[in-house]
Amino acid sequence: MNGPLERIPAYVREFERYVPSRPDAALMRQYGVSRLVRLNNNENALGPPPSAREAVAAFDPARAAVYPSGDAYDLRHALAARFGKSPEQFLVGNGSCEVIASVIRALCAPGDAIVTADRTFAVYEWVARFSGIASRLVPLKNLALDPAAMHAAVTEGVRVVFVCNPNNPTGSWWNRAVLESFLRALDGRAMVVLDEAYREFVDDPDFPDGMEIMESHDNVLVFRTFSKMYGLAGFRVGYLCGSLEATDIIRRTQIAYSVNVLGQVAATAALADDAGHIAATRRMVADAKAFLGRECDALGLEYVCGQGNFAMVRTPVSDTLLYRRFMRQGIMVRTMTGFRFPNWIRVSLAPEAAMQAFATALRSALDAK
């Protein structure tokens, strides 16, 4: 038989699909628990800012019958006002994942390549692979992106370099001097995506602001999201900012109307009054980091706790085995084998009650070995 499915490209056929976790209710039934503490997806346990909550509560359900703005008009104008740029420099997508896909579709063709780290946000590599684009994966150095090695990997055919800053899952980051040096050495030979999904968690004055960096480097694109600090992961709103020319090119590959109306409303409202929310979230994360550090030190466990609302813990047993032990206690963490960190787990940093529950479950899970 010579059907159409036999002509599927090998790079699609060979790609292993992502399998998401089951809904919370199904997981609770599976593991026999009455509650589930989610510490697996770097979500903001404080939820959205009050302004976003109020906007969603005031939403008229009758508007669900009407298509949203096809290009997130109001949100793009709010972003432009916040960052002092043109609304046309912003492209809003159904989460950063859609924006990643749009960038790769617009800038790469089969036979081209991207460069990124080997242990970073996996979606860059995934989208490239199932699009027939090669991924040149550069090993981390001391758990951080290696600028010299990444620069060396940018040879003929490389169109995009993805720099996750801070890096997920290690929390490491390039300061302004390192980033500027990298961009000067690259000299515009490829587009550089600064994925700043966790930028709002960082208050170090030496952290480079991509929105400023791009003003002097036309080949820089900046990604940010409302999923993390702003607590709107369920609405799926991410965005890109670039030069007018670059954003116009990328917009041609983006599906219109992909961002739902509630997401647009909530994100626009969140921007309008976010200072208190950001400060409260940073305090919560700082307290959780200190708590986790004390617990790991007491247990003699290696841990990595950089910038962002997450930490990694090295475990003396298989991360998948530990995951099941955690789940039987109603605690959900992220196994890290898929990030090329076998026998590590990643833990979202959350309020005290959740961290206490994690610590209790951790001790119980380790005692079971």
Residues covered by each model-derived region:
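N-terminal small-domain helix-loop-helix segment of the aminotransferase-like
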Residues: 2-97, 102, 369
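PLP-dependent aminotransferase class I/II
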Residues: 47-49, 219-297, 301-304
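Short acidic capping loops at alpha-helix termini that bridge into adjacent secondary structure
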Residues: 86-90, 111-113, 189, 196, ...
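PLP-dependent aminotransferase-like
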Residues: 106-163
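Active-site pre-lysine segment of PLP-dependent enzymes
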Residues: 147-157, 169-192, 196-229, 245
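Conserved PLP-binding catalytic core of the aspartate aminotransferase-like
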Residues: 285-286, 295-329, 345
